Amino acid sequence: MKHTLFAGILATTAMTTAAMAEDTVTAVHAFPESLIYTKSFLEFVDKVNEAGKGVVQIEVRGGPEAIGMFQQPDAVRAGVVDMVYTPGSFYAGALPEKDALVASNLTAVETRANGGIALIDEIHQEKMGVKYLGWFDSGVCYNLWTRDAPTLDAGGNLDVTGLKLRGNAVYNAFFTEYLGAQVIDLPTTEVYSALERGVVDATGWTQIGLIDLKWNEFLNYRIEPCFFSTDLGTIVNLEKWNSLSEESRTILQDVAIAHEAESSAKLGAVRDEDFAKLEEAGMEVITLEGDAAEAYLAAATQNTWDRMKGLMAESPQGDGNYDKLIELFYKK
């Protein structure tokens, strides 16, 4: 009887110790669950929770309904939540270096290999007190989408006169300084209603996700070439990261690196499927050509770099990493 009781105590103690040893990481995501990018992040969560059984688990608390999308980066810095999946552009004021990802023509796989992501991680830790775990869903760029047929001038350049163009922090510098557009800043969650009411009639958006958001109900034209890159990343409160066991950190980092590659490949296929569906439903593609296309792309890149350099110069750390970031994130 004594032996049985002692064995039971040992078993209970072992179970309690194991339960205590399992790390839990709380997380939120910037966009609604219906969006393809959120689905990608939730796939990453599932992969971690499978690989991390008994070691580390991610507990998703929700999306913008739990913490506002623009408040999420500050929430992870403050430790209100441990992990956030969000565009770097949502915390551009704290880290202008995120523009290296926005203007990049490389993928996470390439910049992981050449040291670019390691540098971005170092900058995140220094400036924001967060660990930059991974750049997910890279390799997808942006298009300008319009309700009405776009106007081109005599040189084939896009004329945005009269467009009610929805803007945001990702592409405002390009839209205002090169295109000369007057933008109306709106969060993603308000764009459908704005299109429906005619508040805006054009927007920048990534190559995929238009169908998920149902904006294709109002937008009829896609303008090529595409520009920029998605800058969707997963950041973790640095104090929380350092408190995790070494095994937990290894699992999280290894799964993140694998998901960088897997998500990039998967979303490339989704893009092709979305384009086919949209064009089958009647969407028309307007392509800038020759010098007009080159000027359009060059302006998108240079205006973003200029913005990054100017904001970096204003920070205490200065713009010493500017040239290195361009070298690592842009192939000329």
Where are these regions (language model features)?
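Bacterial N-terminal signal peptides that target proteins for export
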Residues: 1-6
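Sec-dependent, cleavable N-terminal signal peptides
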Residues: 7, 13-14
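Cleavable N-terminal signal peptides
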Residues: 8-9, 19
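N-terminal secretory/targeting leader peptides
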Residues: 11, 22-110, 130-332
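A gly/proline- and charged-residue-enriched helix-loop-helix capping module
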Residues: 107-127
